[in-house]
C-alpha cells in the first residue's frame, strides 16, 4: 500500500490535534511537506521538541535529548546502548558534535493515529525517564558546581532538587542550610 505524502501529513496533523499537542510547521526545500515540530510536555525535561519529517518512503522522527556529555562518556554511551535494546520505533544516536538524539522512522504505510501516538509516547517516556540519569552521568561535576554557586549566592535551588544527593555537604553549606531553614 502506498500512501501519498499529503495524506500522511494530514494523518499526522490530525493525530496531533486529537492529542492536543502543540506543533508548528517548518518549511523544507525541494517541495517536501513541511516538517512538523511537536512540543511534548515532559516532567523532568519540561519540553521535548520532536521533529516529524515526511519523506518519500518513511516519516523520520527526531528529538534532541541533551548536549554532548562533559564527562564519563563511556558510561553515558553504555547507558544509551543498553537502553536502545528496549525501545520501540526510536533509538539513541549522536550527531556530528556528540549531542544525544532519539531518532526513528515509520513506514508511510504504517502511519495512522495509533502509530503516531505510540512513537511519540515512546519519545516522551524515554526522554523524560532517562533525562536526569543522563545529566547525572555526563554532567555530574557541572551540577555540583552549580549547587555550590547557587548556595554561595542564595539563588533558587528549585530546579536542582532532582540532584539533591549531589548537594555539597561541607560544614559551610550545612551552616547555610541551617540559616535558610531559620535555625
Curated annotation (Swiss-Prot):
Family: To M.leprae ML2442.
Name the UniProt record assigns to this protein: Uncharacterized protein Mb0497
